[in-house]
């Protein structure tokens, strides 16, 4: 059991902790001087510290003792030793959970000192009007004992320091429940994990705000995005989806990548109505394949994990396919394979340069061997496109690109470009470690490592990517239709 020493002075008109504060507090604002030490506290009973809660129009007449960062250490103390102006020592014990309060050694004298103060003419002459903020409903009953009052002071003290409003409680029937009970700490000062802990457990986070506040938060979720690396918040339409604080590359949807690469008003999608028919009738008890497809379609607004079409890149006609990791992890099924195959065949017939932006977890297991056959199908039409027609194909690898996509068209580009810090591999780190029982070196599957080993041609940031692609196309004799349209 931890113990703390407090020097108290009992006099006729006031009770104070020895020490100093830079200023008196009549609000919830923290004191500018928040450092604390043993024997350095003030408890001026003439100061008013207003409580909170639905029925808390009272003032508890206590000053701010410590800042909120010291709250855990303060709560963990179960026993306090005090001494009066005559140097008589007392031991005060209170159990927050049971609201048990005990004072050893000359209990009656100590109670008398408290009772004398609360019965003083200063307190009795206070206004008891409903609009008087200094009116204390606990004091109106002269029989109110010091034990209950100290309990209420301690309870209100902790509430005010943590700055929690009354609506944070999960329901109205808990309004009379002691807040301290919900902020239980261990003797070492570390927070215990408790099922009914209303402040810090994620499971009960929805209880921390009213339904109205929750709806407002949901509405603004469309405006903000959180960085995966530094966890900073930024406007969702941040330029190029690159964190402004740490430079981390955030995931982009296929539609965002199309908007980034293709000139406005020139995008013509292909095969938008092609959807999977669940060819092998793959079903799980938890969630059938068709249900997963429907859910992904509602979430992303896409029919499958790739968008294909034609457009202009700085005035140069191109065929473009962009995979979307948000749709079932960008997995490659029969629809993805068919759409990419048709795109390549169209580019071959029209002699268009080809760009495929890869972001995938690999072949889709729900379609079995049919998904694996897409690797061979796409590779075969690419062979005709590159070898027979001598056309130009650029592969852009984003994070993550793994599995069957890496083993097929992802690594078949005439020029292979990767985004900075992209995760590119055939088998994932966890699979390798579980299979070979060996640790995978950190960063060995990052784009920078692959570039050093010659598996990539370039790592290009998002900002200059469009210009780099335009120069590569012009180098291979693909010129803009109208030079005036070049940005």
UniProtKB/Swiss-Prot annotation:
ZnF bounds (C4-type): 227-246
One Pfam family this sequence matches: Carboxyl_trans
Superkingdom in the source lineage: Eukaryota
UniProt catalytic activity: N(6)-carboxybiotinyl-L-lysyl-[protein] + acetyl-CoA = N(6)-biotinyl-L-lysyl-[protein] + malonyl-CoA
A Gene Ontology cellular-component term: acetyl-CoA carboxylase complex
Cofactor note: Binds 1 zinc ion per subunit.
Pathway info: Lipid metabolism; malonyl-CoA biosynthesis; malonyl-CoA from acetyl-CoA: step 1/1
GO molecular function: acetyl-CoA carboxylase activity; ATP binding; carboxyl- or carbamoyltransferase activity; zinc ion binding
Subunit field text: Acetyl-CoA carboxylase is a heterohexamer composed of biotin carboxyl carrier protein, biotin carboxylase and 2 subunits each of ACCase subunit alpha and ACCase plastid-coded subunit beta (accD).
UniProt family annotation: Belongs to the AccD/PCCB family.
Name this protein carries in UniProt: Acetyl-coenzyme A carboxylase carboxyl transferase subunit beta, chloroplastic
């Amino acid at each position: 059991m931890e113990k703390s020493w407090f020097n108290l002075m009992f006099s006729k008109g006031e009770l104070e902790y020895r020490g100093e504060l830079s200023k008196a507090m009549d609000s919830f604002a923290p004191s500018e001087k928040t450092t604390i030490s043993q024997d350095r506290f003030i408890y001026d009973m003439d100061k008013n510290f207003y409580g909170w809660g639905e029925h808390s129009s009272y003032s508890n007449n206590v000053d701010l003792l410590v800042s909120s960062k010291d709250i855990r250490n303060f709560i963990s103390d179960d026993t306090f030793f005090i001494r009066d102006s005559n140097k008589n020592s007392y031991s005060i014990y209170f159990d927050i959970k049971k609201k048990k309060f005990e004072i050893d050694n000359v209990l009656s004298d100590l109670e008398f000192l408290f009772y004398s103060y609360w019965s003083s003419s200063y307190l009795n002459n206070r206004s008891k009007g409903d609009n008087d903020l200094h009116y204390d409903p606990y004091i109106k009953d002269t029989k109110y004992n010091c034990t209950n009052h100290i309990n209420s002071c301690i309870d209100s003290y902790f509430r005010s320091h943590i700055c929690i409003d009354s609506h944070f409680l999960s329901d109205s029937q808990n309004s009379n429940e002691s807040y301290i009970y919900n902020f239980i700490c261990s003797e070492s000062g570390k927070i215990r994990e408790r099922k009914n802990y209303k402040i810090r457990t994620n499971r009960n986070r929805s209880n921390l705000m009213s339904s109205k506040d929750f709806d407002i938060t949901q509405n603004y979720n469309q405006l903000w995005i959180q960085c995966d690396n530094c966890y900073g918040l930024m406007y969702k339409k941040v330029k190029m989806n690159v964190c402004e604080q740490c430079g981390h590359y955030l995931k982009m949807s296929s539609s965002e990548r199309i908007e980034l690469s293709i000139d406005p008003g020139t995008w013509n999608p292909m095969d938008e109505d092609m959807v999977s028919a669940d060819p092998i009738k793959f079903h799980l008890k938890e969630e059938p394949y068709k249900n997963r497809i429907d859910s992904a379609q509602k979430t992303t607004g896409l029919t499958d994990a790739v968008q294909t079409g034609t457009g202009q890149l700085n005035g140069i006609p191109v065929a473009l396919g962009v995979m979307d990791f948000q749709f079932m992890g960008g997995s490659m099924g029969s629809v993805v394979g068919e759409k990419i195959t048709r795109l390549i065949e169209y580019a071959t017939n029209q002699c268009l340069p080809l760009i495929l932006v890869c972001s995938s977890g690999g072949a889709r297991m729900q379609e079995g061997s049919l998904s694996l056959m897409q690797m061979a199908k796409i590779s075969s039409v690419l062979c005709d496109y590159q070898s027979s027609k001598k056309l130009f194909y650029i592969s852009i690898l984003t994070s993550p690109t793994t599995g069957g996509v890496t083993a097929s068209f992802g690594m078949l580009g005439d020029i292979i470009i990767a985004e900075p810090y992209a995760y590119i591999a055939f088998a994932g780190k966890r699979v390798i470690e579980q299979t070979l029982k060996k640790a995978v070196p950190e960063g060995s599957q990052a784009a920078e490592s692959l570039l050093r080993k010659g598996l990539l041609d370039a790592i290009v940031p998002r900002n200059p990517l469009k210009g780099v692609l335009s120069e590569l196309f012009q180098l291979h004799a693909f010129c803009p239709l109208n030079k005036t349209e070049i940005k």
